Amino acid sequence: MAPSKTEIAPLRAAKYPFGNIVDALRHAAAHTDEGIIVYHPNSISTSSPPQTVSYKDLLHQAEANATRLLQQKLCSPKSIVLVHFESALDSIVWYWSVLLAGGIPALTGPGMFSQNPADRERHLRHLSETLNSPVCLTRPALLAPFEEQTADDRIKARTVDEILAAPEIADVADAPLPALTPSSTDMLALMLTSGSSGNAKAVPLTHQQLLAAFRGKSTAASLRFPRSPFLSWVHMDHVANLVHCHIFAIVSGISQIQVPAPDLLINPAQLLNLISRHRVSRTFMPNFLCAKLRRQLESGSPEYILDPGLNLETLYIDTGGEANVTEVCIALQSLLSRYGAPDNVFKPSFGMTETVAGCIFNSHCPSYDHAQRHEFACLGKPMPGVRMRVTRLDTPSEEAAPGERGSLEVTGEVVFKGYYNNPAATAEAFTSDGWFRTGDLAFIDSNGNLHLDGRTKEMININGVKYLPYELDAALEQAQIPGATPSYFCTFSSRDATMDTEVVVVLYLPSYVESDDEARFSTQSSIIRVVAMHTRSRPRVVPLRPQDMPKSTLGKLSRAKLKTALEEGQFATQQQINDEAIRRYQQKTRASPETPDEAVILDIIKEQLEIRSDDDSFGVNDSILSIGATSMDLVAIIHRINKCLQPSQPLRLTDILKDSTARGLAVALATGAAPRSQDQSSTHVYDPVVTLQPHGTKSPLWLVHPGVGEVLVFVNLAHHITDRPVYAFRAKGFNAAAGLPETPFTSLEELFTTYRDAIKERQPHGPYAIAGYSFGGMVAFEVSKLLEQDGDEVRYCGSWNLPPHIKFRMRELVWEECVIHLFYFVGLMTELAAYTHKPTLQEFNRANRRLDAIRYLRQHCDAARWDELGLSEEYYLLWVGLASNMQSLAVDYEPSGSVKCMDVFVADPLSHVAKDRIDWVEGRLSAWKEFVREDVRFHDVQGAHYTMLNREYVEAFAGTLKNVLRERGL
């Protein structure tokens, strides 16, 4: 085939003074004082300096670790080792440790795991087979998915904590690390192309390939300040960080800044502050982040404070991963220019793992795209070391004409040569003459610039994160949404220039009467909640007619045909009818902000949940919990409200659980700011019920808190229950923190009858469904008994990992034990770490210095998590007191009587209670049979006693719960 006009001649750039990246690190360590500047979570705007690790220190630490890996036989020459961490610094240190030990690091992170347990198992099995049963290095907090493996041939996970704690072998401890001199064709890393669906491909990266890429990237960029550092917030399992920032900086002999992604994604203006403080010469900012930064700067909000004297003269913005809207680039260029940013600061690029990140660059954005009136910025021309071509769709052996859409292919010394241990995928990925098929549709304009024009794959790309349409279809099906016809969901992505990123489109066949606006609104709201839960984005929802959604003879909907029909306007009438009906219903039911505080709070909620500011489908009376907000969203919303409005009495997390609407939070602010009158205090009535999910037509689910008394643990679970309301009980006494006369329960009988009465007030008639987590399991049992004594039917009584006989455990939970359990339960420290402080806590307690005990423990907990929760030391003291009081009520509790049926959810037991699940069930949980008249069933769930509702397990837990409710006729 004749070469394309856009091909670039082979690389002829000067060589580096080393031939591999190991020597590059040695060179940087020996000849520079540069290194890694690490920002820990929530530390950008604090006075504490970031952590600095010089390349010299990195080399020494990695060499020491490499020696340990060899001593403990965890790494051998050319063996593959998974480097699996959340922290960038952990990933960096252990990447080099494996490499210096002669192994091949394969970098992964917790983000590779699906919430579906079957997908996780399948993914790990696939990795084990592909990577030849590798060892995995990780931290204790990340072990859970590896411990779930059931296959015989599984990945063996080891924590680096164990490795570093192991004694050195005496006769080899002083032996020097074998000298490592890799050849240019040796692998330096394996990077995964995908991960959540079990079909990951491993891309080998070689020393020769990376050095060629760095020469090309440097030539294409021609940085004005080449000695200034790089900055990355991307996880280290992506080439955009490992290669394009971390190793590139080392090879270039310059420093690098590593920042946690959440800090910048919540507040992109901080990225500008870091660029100015460190005179950063190169960083990455995809379109969705550019758009968010633009909105911040244009808003002029005092929440987004820029450093005085902000200077962006060194700036060079790599942008890619999704199409860049030209209008966003133009607007942001103007804003950044005020602070010295150079013209054409944006460098839209095309890159993949297989091409070592960006390899085709547009160096004239936005000026070129503005002049050409491009809706989306072009991707420019290949850098040295890469050639590109577009081949015709109908005749792949022929090159497409300028402007003609075809298949994008690339080749060159930067491009990988094949997938690791996957000859079939390699054969499919390359043409007969050795060009790599990217899987993208594209065209090259008359000036030789690349433009992407769709994808051959159906992957949905939201804010740079990819989702599989069939997974969203399945989630909608599993939600059993009233008003939607089963098996008639079709999801895909769509986008126009008004959007920052792609949007999920959901087409569905309604089962309600077309004139029923309320049913239409309820159905659409449920669909939005399900999609938001999975993608953190708000979908475009279009109900269609039966004739619009024909099925094939195999019962399938054609995603491609439906997407084409939508984009061609064939469903415009249905969209208009739906929009008018939704608007009509909202006008009847929605309320607008009535005070400045309500308006501000509503804006904060919308921004946090990524709801467009002009989208009036969410109002001041709508619950944050009803649209898929996670527990971390609640924390962020409270933090942002307090920071923006600076009330005299800051909102607490408990306020949002009490009333999760913008209006309710505004009332809480006003109430907290005003002095508490005697009349207000005297009229306070304790309400134990928190509404976690108000929607659905089936019998409500009632959830009883664990021993800590709070309901935050149920928030993520409630998002997965979309077919029925979900209510949770919150213990009595928390409102005392707000100065209200609310005292804790004085007896179990008071607790039981209070919760029974609250259920009857909101749900006068059965059948009832009630479950309790840990301590709450006992309460659920007793409340169910009271309901049955009144003649009501309880079809589901659930005990989540609690046996009937608990008084001995309750007697063990003295005050210091309650402190330890609370701090572990809310994520302030690990259980192991918390127990090391037990003797000191006992001393404080004996001296009646309980507040000092809380202050002491605070010094040893996760400071970032403490700030996230936003609670005071006095509040934790109150909370511990409530938990201790409540559990002390049960020190003489003896179960008696019976309920008709019970379902016991079984998680891993506490280590000091039972040795394993079999022992736990046979020795303790099976005793429930004595207190159930007809039917007690046991259901295994993933995770342990304190983690079974964690994010990685909650979807599977919800699936089990839904099945149980269905089996019980609910």
Swiss-Prot record:
Region: Adenylation, residue numbers: 135-489
Ranges of residues in domain Carrier: 595-673
GO molecular function, one term: transferase activity
UniProt record, GO biological process: secondary metabolic process; terrequinone A biosynthetic process
Consequence of substituting residue 774 to A: Impairs the generation didemethylasterriquinone D from indole pyruvic acid
Alphabetical list of SUPFAM superfamilies matching this protein: Acetyl-CoA synthetase-like, ACP-like, alpha/beta-Hydrolases
Pathway the protein contributes to: Secondary metabolite biosynthesis
Catalytic residues (UniProt): 774
UniProt xrefs under PROSITE patterns: AMP_BINDING, CARRIER
Entry annotated with the keyword ATP-binding: no
Matching InterPro entries: AB_hydrolase_fold, ACP-like_sf, AMP-bd_C_sf, AMP-binding_CS, AMP-dep_synth/lig_dom, ANL_N_sf, PP-bd_ACP, Thioesterase
Coiled-coil region list: none
Keywords linked to the UniProt accession: Phosphopantetheine, Phosphoprotein, Transferase
EC class name: transferase
Domain of life: Eukaryota
Region (Thioesterase): 700-961
Pfam family, one: Thioesterase
Catalysed reaction equations from the record: 2 indole-3-pyruvate + 2 ATP = didemethylasterriquinone D + 2 AMP + 2 diphosphate + H(+)
Induction (record text): Specifically expressed at both asexual stages. Expression is positively regulated by the secondary metabolism regulator laeA. Expression is also positively regulated by mpkB. Expression is also positively regulated by mtfA.
Enzyme Commission identifier(s): 2.3.1.-
Modified residues (O-(pantetheine 4'-phosphoryl)serine): 631
Function recorded in the entry: Didemethylasterriquinone D synthetase; part of the gene cluster that mediates the biosynthesis of terrequinone A, an antitumor agent. The first step in the biosynthetic pathway for terrequinone A is formation of indole pyruvic acid (IPA) from L-tryptophan by the aminotransferase tdiD. The nonribosomal peptide synthase tdiA then immediately converts unstable IPA to didemethylasterriquinone D (DDAQ D), via condensation of 2 IPA molecules. The symmetric connectivity of the 2 IPA molecules is thought to arise by head-to-tail dual Claisen condensations facilitated by the TE domain.
Record family assignment: Belongs to the ATP-dependent AMP-binding enzyme family.
Family matches, as PANTHER family: BCDNA.GH02901, LONG-CHAIN-FATTY-ACID--COA LIGASE
Name recorded for this polypeptide: Didemethylasterriquinone D synthetase tdiA
